[in-house]
A protein has these predicted regions:
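Functional transmembrane-helix hotspots
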Residues: 96-130
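Juxtamembrane interface at the cytosolic side of transmembrane helices
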Residues: 69, 172-183
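Alpha-helical transmembrane segments of multi-pass membrane proteins
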Residues: 10-18, 82-91, 161
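Hydrophobic secretory-pathway targeting helix
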Residues: 68-69, 77-78, 82-100
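Low-complexity, acidic polar-rich segments
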Residues: 128-150
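Individual transmembrane alpha-helix segments
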Residues: 142-168
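Transmembrane alpha-helical insertion/packing segments
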Residues: 1-70
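Alpha-helical transmembrane segments of multipass membrane proteins
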Residues: 22-30, 55-56, 91-95, 99, ...
Length: 183
């Protein structure tokens, strides 16, 4: 492995660690935002989008430009994809360990129930604001509770399947970002 390839991978790991910490912090902030802070149904929907889409994309763009600059301002499609994939994979691992394992299992073990309660309350508020009948609201809430109950049944196989799908998605995203940031 030549020096530039090595530098790209090391930079990908460093950027991935930072991106993973940022995404983990944003995920935790989003959780507290929707379960404790916001009472507005609009903010319940908009908050997670801002925390999980817009801010992370801004960070990814910053890290991609920074990585390209660190190797002289030029990298091929392969180099861009390799560096970005490494960054995304490390960020995913940090976020998975930090949020999905440590935070969800030890800090907020009842987080899923709190999030579901907040989602049900936001949905009920939206339906009430639209003037829906109480019978329709109760039916929608019952459907949501049924969907949540089905999501509770996770197995090791479904967890592994989710990880594999995430890694494939990360690779596709790295290809897209690699094509955008090659120069």
């Amino acid at each position: 492995m030549n020096d530039i390839e090595r530098k790209i991978k090391i930079n990908g790991v460093k950027s991935g660690l930072l991106l993973g910490l940022i995404i983990t912090a944003l995920s935790i902030a989003s959780y507290y935002f929707i379960t404790s802070i916001t009472k507005s149904p609009v903010l319940f929907v908009a908050g997670p989008i801002i925390f999980s889409v817009f801010i992370p994309i801004f960070c990814v763009v910053f890290f991609c430009f920074n990585a390209r600059k660190s190797i002289g301002g030029y990298w091929t499609f392969k180099q861009a994809t390799t560096g970005i994939f490494t960054m995304f994979l490390v960020a995913y691992l940090v976020q998975f360990i930090g949020k999905s394992i440590i935070f969800d299992k030890f800090v907020e073990p009842n987080g899923i129930q709190k999030t579901q309660t907040a989602a049900i309350n936001a949905k009920a508020d939206i339906l009430k604001q639209r003037g829906n009948a109480q019978v329709a609201i109760d039916k929608d809430i019952a459907d949501m509770k049924k969907d949540f109950a089905q999501q509770q049944n996770t197995s090791i196989g479904s967890t592994i399947q989710g990880i594999v799908i995430s890694v494939l998605f990360i690779f596709l995203l790295a290809l897209v970002f690699g094509s955008l940031f090659k120069k």
